[in-house]
């Protein structure tokens, strides 16, 4: 019998029937439907999608965090979809409507992790400074870790301090034994709105192109590899063959129609990674003592993607549902919904060692990489890379500008597809500043906070001079506090205070010890459901409109960023 804390083999349906059976009516029919599934039937719908915009608690929407993911498709390929309608309606499957919000770690954590004691400060510091990456790296290709990626750890912790290892000054990852180039390269990108360390999201991102992209006449050529990476970066940012690719580490050049060197047989396709492109994506705990990046030695997860083929252009809506029973899984290896990416995912076991994610846990990854409007080729990263040499280094959350949306300029506001309240606020901003606002400025204003859940009160003091965050940020841009006099985002925006950082670590540690990932990976200081005073929806059966259309805060523009 599987145990989650002191709860003996209680499946998600049973837990939810207990939660929602008192005074709600219809509990028998819910239980009948839920008994058909052991756990969450739709783990690919993340907790963010269960956020109350205000329409439930206040009777009207005051926030629209949905627009950053669900919008006009950024590209014409099958990897993305026009799903902007999901800003307007809560479109949950019937089974989810019947069962209610399945992410119990957010709304009822006492049922899932309540029996796991909160670790002390010293216990959590000891935990996060232990190395579980090296062990997994040493065992790659064997047993349960047969698909673990061949990328070595990049930090060590000795004598009370952190040091970056196995990464050179240009971001190339070196073999820890031979010092040779592995092909992996770390890069820095503007974090996706809300996915900040202060919200519990901290990571590194690595890319590797196939061997022939690194060779000329069969010999390794570092300068050639840099050029091919620059070509790819510009292609992902929308620069077509024949146009000028500018601001790269190798200078400005005319975009070729094919990659160079031994990869000259591979066509350059705008908005598409060439087949064989790999990504590695470790997720960390927060450690304020790491002054390099705030990242812990221990990693929570290792995620991996490999491109299989160039994607076809969309011919339908792109939202056709995957047939039941077609999900492939083998020791943490699986494929995203479009089938153009192989994915792998590893997460901590209760002792902190990395193990393959289960099929249900793996489907959680497809939530964001399975085909939404706000990605490019199913990813969030390289098209958001910091330009030039500054972008080829480990993510340190420094020297990042609040790059603007290409689609929003002061000259084209009348033609944009967005609500009247948003448009009026942007007009006010333009009239005062003379240029359109940055991406984060728009996000904070539309989200009425610094995260999708409106749960992080600490960040509000870093965003605004008076701690109030809403559309007034656009009407009164002098309230903006998170940008310095040189136009860069102040690093303190991204980081929580040490006490809160370790508090986030502690709550996640409890999920690890309970092995309760199927109930969610986001952590809050206390239960965050509507009934507990939070903003996570609980019951869904009578919910339709998000209210953002009625409140005039919808936004259907593509979220590509400018480089200025």
From Swiss-Prot:
The keyword Cytoplasm does not apply. It is found in: Cell membrane. It is a lipid-anchor. The keyword Membrane applies. It comes from the Bacteria. One of its GO terms (cellular component) is plasma membrane. The lineage of its organism: Bacteria, Pseudomonadati, Aquificota, Aquificia, Aquificales. A lipid is attached at residue 22 (S-diacylglycerol cysteine). A lipid is attached at residue 22 (N-palmitoyl cysteine). Keywords: Cell membrane, Lipoprotein, Membrane, Palmitate, Signal. This is Uncharacterized lipoprotein aq_1262. Residues 1-21 form the signal peptide.
């Amino acid at each position: 019998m599987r145990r989650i804390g002191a709860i003996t083999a209680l499946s998600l349906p049973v837990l939810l029937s207990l939660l929602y059976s008192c005074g709600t009516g219809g509990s028998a029919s819910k239980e009948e439907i839920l008994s058909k599934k052991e756990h969450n039937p739709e783990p690919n719908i993340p907790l963010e999608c269960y956020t109350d915009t205000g329409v439930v608690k206040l009777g009207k929407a005051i926030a629209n965090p949905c627009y950053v993911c669900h919008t006009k498709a950024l590209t014409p390929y099958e990897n993305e979809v026009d799903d902007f309608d999901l800003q307007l309606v809560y479109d949950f499957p019937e089974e989810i409507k019947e069962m209610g919000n399945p992410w119990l770690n957010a709304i009822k954590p006492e049922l899932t992790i309540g029996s796991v004691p909160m670790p002390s400060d010293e216990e959590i510091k000891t935990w996060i400074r232990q190395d579980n990456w090296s062990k997994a790296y040493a065992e790659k290709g064997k047993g349960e870790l047969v698909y673990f990626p061949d990328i070595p750890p990049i930090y060590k912790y000795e004598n009370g301090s952190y040091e970056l290892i196995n990464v050179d000054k240009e971001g190339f990852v070196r073999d820890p034994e031979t010092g040779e180039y592995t092909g992996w390269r770390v890069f820095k990108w503007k974090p996706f709105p809300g996915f900040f360390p202060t919200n519990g999201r901290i990571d590194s991102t690595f890319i590797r192109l196939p061997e022939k992209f690194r060779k000329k006449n069969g010999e390794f050529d570092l300068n050639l590899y840099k050029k091919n990476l620059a070509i790819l970066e510009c292609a992902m940012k929308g620069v077509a063959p024949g146009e000028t690719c500018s601001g790269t580490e190798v200078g400005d050049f005319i975009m070729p129609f094919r990659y160079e060197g031994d990869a000259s047989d591979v066509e350059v396709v705008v908005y598409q990674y060439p087949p064989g492109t790999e990504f590695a994506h470790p997720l960390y705990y927060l450690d304020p003592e790491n002054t390099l990046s705030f990242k812990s030695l221990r990693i929570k997860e290792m995620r991996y993607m490999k491109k299989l083929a160039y994607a076809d252009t969309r011919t339908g809506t792109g939202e056709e549902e995957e047939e039941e029973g077609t999900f492939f899984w083998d020791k943490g290896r699986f494929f995203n919904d479009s089938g153009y990416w192989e994915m792998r995912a590893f997460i901590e076991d209760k002792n902190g060692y990395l193990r393959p994610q289960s099929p249900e846990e793996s489907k959680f990854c497809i939530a964001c990489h399975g085909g939404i409007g706000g990605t490019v080729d199913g990813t969030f990263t390289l098209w958001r890379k910091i330009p030039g040499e500054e972008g080829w280094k480990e993510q340190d959350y420094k020297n990042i500008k609040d790059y603007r949306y290409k689609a929003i300029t002061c000259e084209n506001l009348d033609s944009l597809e967005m609500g009247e309240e948003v448009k009026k606020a942007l007009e006010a901003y333009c009239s005062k500043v003379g240029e359109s606002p940055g991406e984060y400025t728009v996000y904070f204003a539309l989200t009425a906070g610094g995260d999708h859940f409106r749960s992080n009160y600490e960040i509000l003091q870093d965003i605004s001079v008076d701690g109030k965050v809403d559309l007034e940020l656009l009407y009164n841009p002098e309230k903006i506090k998170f940008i310095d006099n040189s136009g860069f985002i102040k690093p303190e925006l991204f980081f929580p205070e040490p006490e809160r950082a370790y508090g986030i670590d502690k709550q996640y540690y409890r999920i690890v010890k309970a092995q309760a990932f199927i109930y969610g990976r986001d952590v809050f200081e206390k239960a965050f459901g509507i009934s507990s005073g939070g903003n996570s929806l609980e019951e869904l059966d009578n919910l339709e409109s998000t209210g953002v259309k009625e409140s005039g805060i919808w936004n259907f523009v593509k979220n590509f960023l400018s480089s200025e």
